[in-house]
Curated annotation (Swiss-Prot):
GO terms for biological process: nucleoside phosphate metabolic process; ribose phosphate metabolic process. The lineage of its organism: Bacteria, Bacillati, Bacillota, Bacilli, Bacillales. Mg(2+) 3 binds at E92, E96, E142. Keywords: Hydrolase, Magnesium, Metal-binding. Its EC number is 3.6.1.13. The gene is nudF. Pfam families: NUDIX. A motif (Nudix box) lies at residues 77-98. This is ADP-ribose pyrophosphatase.
Length: 185
């Protein structure tokens, strides 16, 4: 089978930020022709599908500047240097919601936009939740409203586009499928 790989000829970092770095790469395509690739480097992130013992999903409502709107999401955040995804998942759950989890299960990991970015999101299911005695502080630039919703209401939030991001829609549909499969047993 013919190779589909591109060979990097030159690489230039054109931006280094708090969250992302941006590179422009000159590449040789599989057919021998030259092209340029703009690549966003990201440390990765986690997302937490937190479900109470009563079956409610813990979600957060927050304004997202790139979208210029407020959306509803599952708790999520960026991996800090040297952090394991499990640690980040618990940290973000605690910071954003005031809950912690005794049981944390990795559901999946996926690349958000592999055509131009290397960001990977690790998605976890958090169960056996309890409220922290002392809530951890949010980042100074973070403002969220915590919500508890049923799966049915979460699906309505997806339909109404209040849930507008892939990680949250994925997590809600995962839970819907999980519950449907359990009901068949």
């Amino acid at each position: 089978m013919k190779s589909l790989e591109e060979k990097t000829i030159a690489k230039e970092q054109i931006f280094s930020g708090k969250v992302i770095d941006l590179y422009v790469e000159d590449v040789e395509l599989p057919n021998g022709k030259a092209s340029k690739r703009e690549i966003v480097k990201h440390p990765g992130a986690v997302a937490v599908l937190a479900v109470t013992d009563e079956g409610k999903i813990i979600m957060v409502k927050q304004f997202r500047k790139p979208l210029e709107r407020t959306i509803v999401e599952i708790p999520a955040g960026k991996l800090e240097k040297g952090e394991e995804p499990e640690y980040t998942a618990l940290r973000e759950l605690e910071e954003e919601t005031g809950y912690t989890a005794k049981k944390l299960t990795k559901i999946t990991a996926f690349y958000t936009s592999p055509g131009f970015a290397d960001e990977i999101v690790h998605v976890f299911l958090a169960e056996e939740l309890s409220v922290l005695e002392e809530k951890r502080e949010l980042d100074e630039d973070e403002f969220v409203e915590v919500m508890e919703v049923t799966l049915e209401d979460a699906l309505k939030l997806v339909e109404s586009r209040e849930v507008y991001d892939a990680k949250t829609a994925y997590a809600i549909q995962y839970l819907q499928l999980k519950e449907a499969l359990q009901a068949q047993k």
